[in-house]
Amino acid sequence: IIGPVLGMVGSALGGLLKKIG
């Protein structure tokens, strides 16, 4: 359960960082 959730969160955070950076 934790694995997939962390993956989704990581993808979301990565997208935000790319937009900001």
Curated annotation (Swiss-Prot):
General function of this protein: Has antimicrobial and hemolytic activities.
Q: Name one GO biological process term.
A: defense response to bacterium
- Taxonomically, the superkingdom here is Eukaryota
| Assigned GO CC terms | extracellular region
Q: What is this protein called?
A: Bombinin-H1/H3
Where, per the database record, does this protein carry D-allo-isoleucine? Answer: 2
* Annotated coiled-coil segments of the chain: none
Report, as the record phrases it, the tissue specificity of this protein. Expressed by the skin glands.
Residues recorded with modification Isoleucine amide = 20
Q: Where is this gene product found?
A: Secreted
| Organism whose genome encodes this protein | Bombina variegata (Yellow-bellied toad)
**Primary site of residence:** secreted
What are the entry keywords? Amidation, Amphibian defense peptide, Antibiotic, Antimicrobial, Cytolysis, D-amino acid, Hemolysis, Secreted
Family to which the UniProt record says this protein belongs: Belongs to the bombinin family.
